[in-house]
Regions:
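Glycine-rich phosphate-binding loops at beta-strand->alpha-helix junctions
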Residues: 211, 234-263, 267-269
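Phosphate-interacting basic helix/loop segments used at nucleotide- and nucleic-acid interfaces
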Residues: 7-21, 134-140, 221-225
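Terminal alpha-helical anchor/extension segments at protein ends
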Residues: 106, 174-176, 212, 251, ...
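Active-site neighborhood for divalent-cation/phosphate handling
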Residues: 26, 30-132, 237, 267-273, ...
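N-terminal phosphate-binding loop and adjacent alpha-helix
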Residues: 1-18, 202-207, 279-283
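Glycine-rich phosphate-binding/hydrolytic loop that grips phosphoryl groups
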Residues: 126, 245, 263-301
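Small-residue (GG/TT-enriched) beta-loop-alpha framework at ligand/catalytic clefts
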Residues: 23, 29, 85-192
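Adenine-nucleotide phosphate-binding core of ATP-dependent small-molecule kinases
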Residues: 121, 169, 177, 181-182, ...
Length: 301
């Protein structure tokens, strides 16, 4: 998820903003969870924010495995009640400055103004909260399986909080490459054919089904990592997210193979829409917009 060509990303963003006729240029960005360090530390309750920051920076070597002058960090006092009323839990979040600056640079090249830097897992948590009550009664532990272009991320939610995140290098790019190789297409042509579902008759059996089986294996492996590193041995529900969540047959196959109910995430399920919004397009893309939705909701914090 590194930005290798900020100019190209900025150009694409500028064209997207112009096409969408966006009124505000203020933006919230998210850094991948794998690039971020989070720690919960206990501090005195009567400290103000300036005092907390000084204390955190003084103790930074305990928490951050790279030089402080290379770190972008923030903190927030959590509402947790501790046994000692004179102490509070503080969430510390840190990443390398370059991880924020690379994204900010691309946004600025696209004519946008970065205002907030968040973390992908926090954005997903934010988005999940607005539609979690649409899940069946008794669902408390939910796995959000986000299958992107090159990365698949499992985020496990417990009572509307992210308690586990695991990323692995696997995504829809593999399917596009298989289409490209089998049918002699360019990568761009293969991507368009995959999206429009205009492929030869043998596509489902020869290309799609092996890819779906690979997704199941990746999902099962991620769940096993979660179970082996926590006190949990099962989850209640799986939500499919990401640009590949709507691949025909994927949700059904995951449900059959993993033994959990699987549905496709839609963070906009309970939202109203402006008349000029193409609702059908939003519904088609909803599963891939979890992070974007969570970031947009920051404006209501």
């Amino acid at each position: 998820k590194n930005i290798l060509n900020p100019e190209a990303v900025g150009d694409a963003l500028e064209r997207a903003v112009n096409l969408a006729n966006v009124q505000s240029t203020d933006v919230a960005l998210a850094v991948p969870t794998s690039m971020v360090i989070t720690k919960i530390i206990e501090m005195d309750a009567d400290m103000n924010d300036d005092e907390r920051e000084i204390q955190i920076r003084d103790d930074a070597e305990q928490y951050i495995p790279f030089p402080l002058d290379e770190a972008s960090l923030d903190f927030e006092v959590l509402p947790d009640r501790l046994a000692n009323p004179n102490r509070v839990n503080v969430l510390l979040v840190a990443t390398r400055i370059e991880n924020v600056e690379a994204r900010a640079e691309a946004l600025e090249l696209g004519g946008l103004t970065p205002k907030i830097a968040d973390v992908e897992s926090f954005a997903i948590e934010n988005a999940f909260k607005v539609f979690s009550d649409t899940l069946p009664m008794g669902v408390n532990t939910v796995g959000i399986l986000d299958i992107g272009h090159t990365m698949t991320t499992l985020s496990v939610m417990q009572n509307n909080k992210v308690i586990y995140t695991r990323e692995q290098v696997f995504g829809g790019k593999q399917l596009t490459q298989e289409i490209q190789n089998r049918y002699g297409l360019s990568f761009e042509e293969a991507g368009r054919a995959k999206k429009s579902r205009t492929l030869p008759d043998d596509y489902d059996i020869e290309v799609l089904e092996p890819f779906l089986e690979a997704v199941v294996q990746q999902a099962a492996r991620s769940l096993q990592f979660f179970f082996s590193s926590s006190q949990f041995n099962e989850i209640d529900h799986i939500l499919l997210a990401g640009g590949n969540a709507n691949i025909p047959g994927l949700a059904k196959l995951l449900q059959q193979k993993l033994g959990y109910r699987v549905t496709i995430a839609n963070p906009f399920l309970q939202m109203g829409f402006s008349p000029q919004i193409d609702i059908k397009k939003i519904e088609n893309d909803a599963s891939s917009l979890m992070v974007a939705c969570g970031l947009a909701l920051r404006s209501f914090d």
